[in-house]
Amino acid sequence: MDQLLPPAPLLDAARFELAIRRLADSLGHGTDRSMFRGAGQEYEQSRPYQAGDAVKAIDWRITARTGRLHVKEYEALRRVPVWLLVDTSASMTVGSRRPTKYEAAVCTAGGLALACLGRMRPVGCIGVGGRSLVVRPTLSRLATLGWLHRLRRYRLDEPTDFAASARLLEPLIAERSLVIVLSDLHDPTAAARLARIAQEHDVCLLVFRDPAERGLGAGILRAREAETGRALTTTGRFPTRRAEERLAALRGAGIDGLVLDTDRPSTARLRLFFSRRRPLAGRRP
């Protein structure tokens, strides 16, 4: 049975849109050299001056070194598309407190999407779970808000199928793209598939973590896994390091990422993370 994300912190539809717009403004501020950069120009080389060249294009450093006028040539950058892979599985929707991992992921996806649109970067989305959600990258704000509102609905029994979602994505990406994955990495098949995608595209990973996954108090803990129903018994003092361990393993495949705890502010960390990433056009294929 489908359920709607609870009233707070996403509130109603209008307040949900307001929240992600504010996040988009915060993420986009001061990050023009990061993932949010879209169309523009990139320096390619300098060549000798020719009659008719603009004075503002003169490369004064090369001119001073050679004694001959040189001008800079620039290469136009394409509008590199962005794909958001949002984990919609049951493990994302269950948490020890609000917001859940899923609530945080949907809000973050919304902020990233609108920030990219503000920089003229087309954005698409694929739901990583049992539902059918595939939206090709677009510059349409209306279409983007449409799939964001679809993400507000969730199921408590939805499985993860990262492998199937990745197989679906691969033939859809005809050109080099930026792929941002928002997940808790509970699916063990995710690492291999992401490594394969990273061979052709720029991939980064945002891992959402519930406070309980950092470790509980003393004592024995009995629990049941939300998606598979598998029961387990563990000690509360043992912190869950799965997110960091899997993220560290993926770095070897050229995938960088960030662990986001749902009980801690994330906007500043996200802004810093993306501002420090090299633009996709400068990353090695």
Regions found by a protein language model. Give the residues of each.
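Exposed, interaction-prone extracellular/peripheral surfaces
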Residues: M1-M35, Y43-D53, I62, G67, ...
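N-terminal juxtadomain amphipathic helix
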Residues: V55-A57
